[in-house]
Amino acid sequence: MSVIESIRGVLWARRHRPDQVAIVMGASHERFAPQELLRQAVLAEEAGFDAVACSDHLTPWWVPGGLAPAHCGNAWVWLGAASQATGAIGLGTGVTGVIHRYNPVVVAQQVATLEALAPGRTFLGVGSSEAMNEVPAGMRWPDTAEQLQRTAEALEIIVRLLDGETVDFRGVYFTTTGARLYDRPARRPPVIVSAFHEQIAEVAGQLADGLWTLGSPTIAPKVIAAYRRGAEKAGREPGEIWLQALAATGADDDEALAGSREWKPALVQELYTHDIHSTGDIQAKGEDVSDGQFTRANLVSADPGSHVAKLRLLSELGATGIVVVNASGADPEGLIRLYGRDVLPRLREG
């Protein structure tokens, strides 16, 4: 079985038609405590989501105790618990940074272990992280060129280890000596790369099994095209294309917006590339995002029809999977129930 077939085995298990788009719930460690997120994962499986992708952050997007509660449980410890609390839903990170804080050998070991605990259900989302997650851990935040090279080196190591190689690697930033996975699962977890810019998207096409980017009509087409170019250059079939948006609901649209405003910094591109790492500075950057910009870019509405319409627009951009990040602070479990009752069935009926 190819890696692409293996990921489709995870995400297409509930498909009524093979062309349906996978809907993945984003579980937000920054906003919800670990036990609460476990409850959300169980509810997501019951509601009919195809997978759960949990964030992997050390620092939240806002000042603790300000706009919203702030948490940041460890993604990999939580995924181990989620693998035992759920039975069939896909599980993985959305996404793990691989430039500093995590060594790529350890990342490969972590996802291989998760696959052993949840056979046939796992995937690995990786990216270059943000300064907020690296600088507090004592790491130097690199410029964009170094971020790109670090990510490419880490990605090569991870993929080779998951493919069963013993890896001797001498890169500019990473080195391995006889590294291997001693508990390598029978099925190789697919690796999906987060990319907001064309250069890393092209690397993803050359080395990885899928692309993960923002569901923006101005960003997604260029990034997707670069990903496909990279795959073509490497003589590979393009894999999965996941588009991401935040989602929130409430008693009405005003409550949906009020319960998700803390997420505005996630729309600021500068936070993904520049050394901005304090929660105060991060939150301040989000203040430049208007309510209108925030709601247009995301799924923020009490009306399930609005969610369905926007998800269909994302599908038309070329998505094979859509990551719906649960940003519904007013009623996170209500968002999951809304999707299970009124959104997912309408999407899947055509």
Regions found by a protein language model. Name each.
Residues M1-G350:
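Active-site-adjacent structural elements that line small-molecule/cofactor binding pockets in enzymes
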